[in-house]
C-alpha cells in the first residue's frame, strides 16, 4: 500500500477535515486505539536517512479509575536508550463533543520515571489513579479517510515546554503499516526548533 507523504497528505488532510460532516460511530474510537497500540519504530527510515533518529514508540491500554473513556499509555525513546524515554503520556480516546471526529486528549503523568516500561506489566495491573495524571490541554482530532485516519492538533497547536519549544503541532496519518507523523516544536517567536521538516517520521509496526 502506498503511504501518503509530503504535500499529498496536506491535501488529503484538508479534504478529510473539510468534507461534509456526520456523526461517527463509536467503533471509530476502538479502531484508532488498535492502530496506536503495540510497538512502532523509525529504524527502517533511519537506516535510509542519516538525520532521522531511530525512535521506538510503545503504546498499551490502561484503566483509569472512575473513567468511562478508553485510555492508552504511550512512551517514546531512542532505540539506543530505551530505559530513558523522552516522552511519556496518557491518551484519552473518545468521540469529539460534536461526534464528528475521534479526539485523542493528552494527559501528563505524575512522576514520569515511575511509569517507565508500564506496558511490560500485565494488562490487569495497569490501573491508574485519576489524580496521578493531569490534563495537558492538548488534543489531536482524527477523521477517517478511505482506509486511513488523518489527524491534526487543535487550532493553534498545544502549549509546550520542551527543548526550547513553547508550542507543538502535529499531523498524523494512521495506516495499516503504522503511522506517519509531522511532529514539530516552535519557540515563542514562531520559529521551528525541532521536528519534521521536509518529510514525516515514519513509524512502522514491530512484532514486539
Language model features by range: what are they?
Residues 1-5:
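Positively charged n-region of N-terminal signal peptides that target proteins for export
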Residues 26-50, 54, 62, 77-208:
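Calycin-type beta-barrel ligand-binding domains and close structural analogs
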Residues 71-73:
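Glycine- and aromatic-enriched membrane insertion/assembly motifs of diderm outer-membrane
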Residues 7-16:
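Bacterial N-terminal signal peptides
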